[in-house]
C-alpha cells in the first residue's frame, strides 16, 4: 500500500516552499487552440484578426502546479488514469498577452485524505509576465485515487491548508440558465493544448481508471463553464472576468449536454452548478466579474 506523509511534507500545517520559476512560452496558435478546445465560438477568442482578439481568461489553467517542489517519498504521484482534477480556482489579475513568455511558480499547500484509499492534494501557483507583474493566481486540487491501483493509499493524517469549501446554491429557481453540447471530438481537440492523460482518449486507460469509457478533461469542463458564464453575464468581455472556482463532482462524457444553473449572490458574484441530465457534475462553484 502506498503511504502519504503530509505531516512531514507540510510541518506546522504551513505551505511548502515555492519552487523555482518555470519559464513558459506560448504563441497565438496556442491561444486559438485552447479556445476551440473549450468550445468557444465567439470570434473575439478564435479569430486572430478580430479587433477584440484576446486570450480567454482560463487559458493558463493548465499551468497550475507547474514546478511545485513535492517530495514524492512523502506525497507519491499517481499514474494518469488515477490522478484526476477535483477542484480548481483561478483569479485574473492582469490579462495575458496573445503570445510571449511568462513565469510560473508553485508550491504544495495541502494534502488530506479523501474517502477510503484516496488523497486530495492542493497546490498554489502564480503566473507573472515579462514585466514581473502578477497576472494569474491559481489553486489546483487533484484527487489521487491510488499509486498502483484504485484505492491503494493507506489511511493518513492530513496537513496544510485547503481552499476546498462547501458552497450551497439557493433553493429557488436559477436566475440564469445556459448550456452547451460536448461534441464527440471535444476531448480530442482539448488534449492538443497539452493534457495528454490517456484517461480522456484511450478506452483501456479509462477502464483502468474506473470508467466505462473515456471522460472529458475536467479542465475542459471548467473552460466550458467559464465561457458560458462570460457569454451570459459579461457579453463575452474578457476584461470583466475576475475569478472562478469549481469542484468536479461527476465526470462529463462526450455528446453530453452540459447545463449551467446560475444564481445571483450580490453585485458581480454568482453561484452556479452544472448538470448533465439529473446528475450534478460541477458544484461548490462561484464566478465573480465586474
Regions found by a protein language model. Name each.
Residues 2-13, 86-177, 252-255, 259-290:
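HotDog/MaoC-like acyl-thioester-processing domains
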Residues 1-103:
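Hydrophobic, proline/glycine-rich low-complexity stretches
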Residues 35, 39, 59-60, 107, ...:
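Residue-level recognition of well-ordered secondary-structure positions
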Residues 34, 137, 241-243:
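Hydrophobic residues on conserved beta-strands that form the core of alpha/beta folds
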Residues 14, 28, 49, 63-65, ...:
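Solvent-exposed, flexible loop/coil residues
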Residues 82, 117-119, 238:
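A generic structural micro-feature
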Residues 204-269, 274-280, 290:
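Catalytic-pocket segment enriched in acidic/His residues
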Residues 2-48, 158-221, 228-231:
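A contiguous, surface-exposed recognition patch within enzymatic or periplasmic domains that forms
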